[in-house]
Design a protein with these regions (language model features):
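Flexible, glycine-rich beta-alpha linker
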Residues: 1-17
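C-terminal substrate-binding subdomain of Rossmann-fold SDR/epimerase-dehydratase oxidoreductases
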Residues: 5, 9, 24-144
Length: 144
């Protein structure tokens, strides 16, 4: 199983991943750090969808071969993610653009066709539907 960009409640606030970074910065009213022009894309898989894929994989015939990509084939630009986080948190944070690291990929999106064919799985939770409980978790953690 190859896991792509999972997010959700119980993430560590300092884990260095973009979802937690943006949410923490927005809730604290800090500038949101954007690298490059924000047009690079990623896909984000809500933790509940990941767990469902794991359960299906464990319940599948042992002849299953992989690796099987588990993620969300729907892409989102970093700019779209930041704007969604600002809107959903009600933050007044500003976006600050910094140079893009030379090794940062422009696109990262899994091909989940094997998961669909062999596990009958595909993600069900939209980015915004997954961000809501994730933001609520961080709001309790950071703001009390």
């Amino acid at each position: 199983m190859r896991i792509f960009n999972t997010y959700g409640p119980r993430m560590h606030p300092n884990d260095g991943r973009v979802v937690s970074n943006f949410i923490v910065q927005a809730l604290r009213g800090q500038d949101i750090t954007m690298f490059g022009d924000g047009q690079q894309t990623r896909s984000f898989c809500f933790v509940d969808d990941l767990i469902e894929a794991m359960v299906r994989m464990m319940a599948t015939d042992a002849s299953l071969t992989g690796p099987i990509n588990i993620g969300n084939p729907g892409e989102c630009s970093m700019l779209q993610l930041a704007e969604a986080v600002v809107r959903l948190t009600g933050s007044r944070s500003k976006l600050v653009f910094k140079p893009l690291p030379s090794d940062d990929p422009k696109q990262r999106c899994p091909d989940i066709s094997m998961a669909q064919a062999q596990l009958g799985w595909q993600p069900q939770v939209s980015l915004e539907d997954g961000l809501a409980p994730t933001i609520a978790y961080f709001r309790r953690l950071i703001l009390g």
